[in-house]
Amino acid sequence: FHLVYATSTNPDQRRSAAVIQQMFQQIYIDMTISSVEIAQHLQRMQQHDFDIANASWIADFNDASNFLDLLRTTADNNYGGYSNPKYDALMDKAQQTVDLKERGRLMEQAEQLALRDYAWLPCYFLLTMDIVQPWVKGWIPNIRGFNRTRWLSTDSRPKD
């Protein structure tokens, strides 16, 4: 059995592709890695021109819909072409629900459905660790790991 793994030339993605290739070899699946520049990689994903592809997503706001909306049938970034009317209906209902607990429950059901359907196969999650001295003020931990320096200030640095 042979698969082509589409990825960009990003060093992290190439390393993860090599690890996945080794894992597939252990179960007797031959995998070729096809690395191209990011613009070409995005284009082939939009055209669904791949067997398996590495797609990355970074949450730009703190809500589960940031990831779950990607799997809606009509989503622009639904590169795998996942389509499940039950999933879409759950997400539509969640979008219209103002009760946060109910909304969360609906999105959890949608997530479980997508996992059961293998709509995605998450390989890894990026982690950022911020080490900030106590005299730095204005630093707010957030999902994007983003703090503008114009909002930062410092108190007197303690003497050693």
What are the residue ranges of the model-derived segments?
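Detector for C-terminal structural segments
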Residues: T9-M23, H41-D160
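Short, well-structured beta-strand/strand-turn elements
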Residues: Q25-A39
